[in-house]
Amino acid sequence: MAAAPSATAPKHNYTLGTNASQLELYKYLKTVPPIPELRQAVTIKKYEEASVDDTLYPLIDEHQIIMVVGAFFGDEGKGKTVDAVARHPACTCVARVNSGENAGHTVFDDIGRKYVFNLAPSSLLTPNTRNYVSSECVMDPISFMEREIGQFIKSNMPYKDKLFVGNVFVVTPYHKLLDLLGSAPNSSTLKGMSPIHASKVTKRGIRLDHIFNDEGVLRARLAKDMDTYYGLLKVKGLTDKDVVRRCEEENADGVERVPGYVVDFARAENKIDYLVKLYTERVKNNKDFPRRCDVTHELRAALARGEKLLLEGPQSYWLSNAREKFWESTTSADTTAGGLLASAQFNFQRYKVLVINVHKAPGSSRVGIGANPSSFVPQDYYSAQDIKTLEALPKGGCVDFDKIQNFFYTKAFNTESKTFNGIYEPLEYEDATGKYNIGVAMSIASARHHGECGAVTKKPRVCGFFDCVLHFEVNAVQGPYLSISAVDRGDDYDRIGITIAYVYYDVGNKMVDANGRVYKNGDIIKAGDPVPCEMALYHCYPIVKVINGWKGAPIAASKRRPNEPLPKGVCEFIANVEFFTGAKVISIGNGPRGSDIIYLKQ
């Protein structure tokens, strides 16, 4: 059990072992009365496997616009569902319509070659699709060419007739430096998202078309927008040499978080000349740059012809800047289903829209900073200790995942007790490297065992329980259809936990006023109750329902026969998620390949 960070001063002396503050916290939390839902009987349906033709395709047939969106904090494994939808015969167009390269997904072609996409739609390798990056997206065209298009050039994979780019907002090197210099350590992807969206809403900066037109206008707009960059340097008392040094420090561990051309910009004496030359040579006069078009017009025309359109959602519902609850720690675009539809600029009265939410469990995760009530450790546990990659985790510590998860679910959760209230005891797990708070051990072991690190940042993700409190709202806004990825991870668990409620507790007995409701110690927030703002969520702890696992009856595609009955534990997990959230689970992931999906008979 980890003490919550303060919303105003989230600096802590975190420890590996259980400390006095955690023991003091548990001293109170163990007195919280059990809520009836912990013992409430949930009807366990017999979920049966069906084909994609009998489950997903009929849904697609009934709609013109299909959206695949994240339902938690990103990194849910959306690419697999995107690929499945894109392979529908009538789905001809796939588009990214907002946000930028702060997303990340890995796909493999038919001969096993690996491609990593950040802004380009992940269906670029899917036959018979046209792929678009819409004008409401933000793009660093240099990074886009180097990291994404460069993969196609290197492998001689044609893309000119499959990928089209609209008049995007241009992320410049100074946007990325503003991100680096202005963000708290380990709190950002360093892709310049906040600064470019600030330029966007203040109508400064440049769009892609500016690079292809009058150079004088291009120079003037860049100069005006760079006032913010120079202003930050002045306020912080930084020189160009200081900025270069900061970039080198960020890249010192071998992970290039600040690209070379961004460092060169910081070194450049005449920065406007540097940018104009950079964009002229590597964008305007670059024969390899993708074809440009009015994406909105092309997509509307496709819909008018009766074609189906897939909108690929970046990030997720709770990382959307339009969501009040986590506003301080979100991305800078509206990445909800409604935000995607608005960015696409369609007449929503004319078309039927299908939304498929994607979540991940076990091992639901988040990167960055902010509140995360269902996590094993506070969300800033790694960032506060400057742990930037999985390799920086305690060497040799918490490597026995099987032993740790068993200890966690059978010892820390005393489910046999009549007074069990869904809150685990902060016991210590010990291995050859020392003693670990069980939440810390579970967090480290989960990150290692499941390879949970950011697709963009490489930072270890903070793992936790499937959060029914948060998903209830997602389902209310853009449900009911839900695909849960990585369920085959449950093959390695004796039991599975899901969060069905929170309890509010502040060690200083402080109350939080959120939307007129005052939250005080002992208040319970259940699935279906209003979700408070982050100021309150920092002091919320998960009430966990523990479900029997299915260890010994694996569902992983490499071990399971097709159409084999699903284990009782899997059915119990799905039934509880549906019961507490109102969602309708249409598929579960059971392996790393795109085809490793079990569709559920509807």
Swiss-Prot record:
Cofactor: Mg(2+)
Keyword presence, Nucleus: no
GO biological process, alphabetically ordered: 'de novo' AMP biosynthetic process; IMP metabolic process
InterPro entries recorded: Adenylosuccin_syn_GTP-bd, Adenylosuccinate_synth_dom1, Adenylosuccinate_synth_dom2, Adenylosuccinate_synth_dom3, Adenylosuccinate_synthetase, P-loop_NTPase
Family matches, as Gene3D superfamilies: Adenylosuccinate Synthetase, subunit A, domain 1, Adenylosuccinate Synthetase, subunit A, domain 2, Adenylosuccinate Synthetase, subunit A, domain 3
SUPFAM superfamilies for the chain: P-loop containing nucleoside triphosphate hydrolases
Residues given in the record as GTP binding sites: 74-80, 104-106, 461, 589-591
Entry binding sites for IMP: 75-78, 102-105, 189, 203, 315, 331, 459
Assigned keywords, A-Z: Cytoplasm, GTP-binding, Ligase, Magnesium, Metal-binding, Nucleotide-binding, Purine biosynthesis
Predominant location category: cytoplasm
One Pfam family from the record: Adenylsucc_synt
Pathway(s) where this gene product acts: Purine metabolism; AMP biosynthesis via de novo pathway; AMP from IMP: step 1/2
EC number(s) given by UniProt: 6.3.4.4
GO cellular component, one term: cytoplasm
Cofactor binding: number and manner: Binds 1 Mg(2+) ion per subunit.
UniProt-annotated binding residues for substrate: 455-461
Entry's family note: Belongs to the adenylosuccinate synthetase family.
Note: Parasitic protozoa lack the de novo purine biosynthesis pathway and rely exclusively on the salvage pathway for their purine nucleotide requirements.
Annotated protein name in UniProt: Adenylosuccinate synthetase
